[in-house]
Amino acid sequence: MSVDKIELPNYKLKHELWNSITHGLGAIFGIIALFLMLLKVCGIYPNNDVIYDKEFIYKIIGVSIYGFGIITCMTISCLYHALAKNNGKRVFRVIDHDFVFVLVACTYTIFCLGSIREESMWNGLVPYSGWIIFVIVWALIALGITMNSINIKKYAVLSMIIYICAGWTIIFASDILFTKLTLSGFLLLLGGGIAFSIGAILYGIGKKKSVWWHTVFHIFVLIGIILQFFSVYFFVL
């Protein structure tokens, strides 16, 4: 799809200002979150001894990917909404949608590598559940990014379906996650997923009625990110 054929929403300056601010705040939160997670994993806090073994390495990798996902997704969204209407904004619209998928995959990565990597789900029937979920989610995300990049308008519905399916793949490992995260951690993870889904559904239903629904979507994304960060920080690391 050629760049000049990519349609841009008819947002006014005040709408784009709020869209940019909300995810600009998300980018700042992502930087702080990554810093705090690295501090915790590396054991810089007093009386927190770190064993530099395989578990430590996987958590460092998982945290780095997770933090990267939050920061880049929020930053790209902020920049996209801040740009004037030109071909640059059209390109960033596609990238912005792509990185929503990336955020989902990066969030899964820390849970898969840091919590359930070698655990068995379904009462021990399926070993290495973390790796299986990891591969499935990244495969779905790759498909979603491909479809979205080929034609953002033509495959909009398919992309949304893939986004929701990828986001809820975690239900297949809900039994082991509930055990590993405890009730509080699991509810934070679940709450984040619900926030993402509600935001996407409300935006899909309301976008033709009011452009403010996109800002509402941004707010729900921020809520989802914050809830899942708490799940990671307190119950995975």
Language model: regions and residue ranges:
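Multi-pass alpha-helical transmembrane bundles in non-GPCR membrane proteins
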Residues: 1-237
